[in-house]
């Protein structure tokens, strides 16, 4: 079984600040981490490796410094790491990102592609499903459990819903998007860390993925972020102990004070 896990390097959102003049994220000096949902997906892949001897590849698209999360994944136990980096890929929105990653995946053998549900720096939850559409593969999102049947080569996925869950079955090859909250990723071991720095991280450019330039990077991005801003904190609420009859009058008076009515 061959599994490919798509991961992303993201800024630690607990440290993120926003430039008030430009409305953009200030990334300089902010520590970067592996996206939590992606790390959860990686753990599911490694569990299948432990149980069935699966070969696990990780791929990320980003700047050269994204190699750090690939080394982390190698230290956790993956077999192969690929960094997709090129100036032509810069400025990509989710559609252009998924086009580039899908192009890379077309050159690889896989039975299962795992992505995180969404990245904490964008929260779109679009890239995983878009990859599935580019590759014309069945997909299940919001995965919170994953099982494999060797005899039938099918995956059984528990999908989170708002008020419960579904259990679905898909034939390989297929795509799933994972939830960080559903699994505890393993820690890197000392031996894994040492071994990770002896392993090769493959570096691929845009010429390796065979995707037209008008479909990648800024040129292939029909959307762009106009502005980012911090959440506006609301003032503390008030509590009143009144009868139902008094409550109506109180609410009306408060609405008048706010010039709502």
Please identify what each model-predicted range represents:
Residues 1-261:
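N-terminal glycine-rich FAD/FM-binding segment characteristic of electron-transfer flavoproteins
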């Amino acid at each position: 079984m061959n599994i490919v896990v798509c991961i992303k390097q993201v800024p630690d959102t607990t440290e993120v600040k926003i430039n008030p003049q430009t409305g953009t994220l200030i990334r300089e000096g902010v520590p970067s981490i592996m996206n939590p949902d992606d790390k959860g997906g990686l753990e599911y892949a490694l569990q299948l490796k432990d149980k069935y001897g699966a070969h696990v590849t990780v791929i990320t698209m980003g700047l050269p410094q994204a190699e750090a999360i690939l080394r982390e994944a190698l230290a956790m136990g993956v077999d192969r790491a690929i960094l997709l980096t090129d100036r032509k890929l810069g400025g990509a929105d989710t559609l252009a990102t998924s086009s580039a990653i899908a192009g890379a995946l077309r050159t690889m053998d896989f039975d299962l592609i795992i992505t995180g549900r969404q990245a904490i720096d964008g929260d779109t939850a679009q890239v995983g499903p878009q990859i599935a559409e580019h590759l014309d593969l069945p997909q299940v999102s919001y995965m919170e459990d994953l099982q494999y049947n060797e005899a039938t080569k099918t995956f059984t996925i528990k999908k989170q819903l708002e008020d419960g869950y579904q259990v679905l079955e898909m034939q390989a090859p297929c795509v799933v998007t994972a939830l960080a909250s559903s699994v505890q990723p393993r820690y890197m071991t000392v031996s894994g860390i040492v071994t990770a720095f002896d392993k090769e991280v493959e570096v691929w450019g845009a010429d390796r993925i065979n995707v037209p330039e008008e479909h990648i990077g800024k040129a292939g991005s029909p959307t762009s972020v106009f502005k980012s801003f911090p959440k506006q904190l609301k003032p503390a609420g008030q509590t009143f102990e009144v009868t139902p009859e008094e409550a109506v009058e109180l609410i009306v008076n408060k609405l008048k004070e706010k010039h709502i009515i």
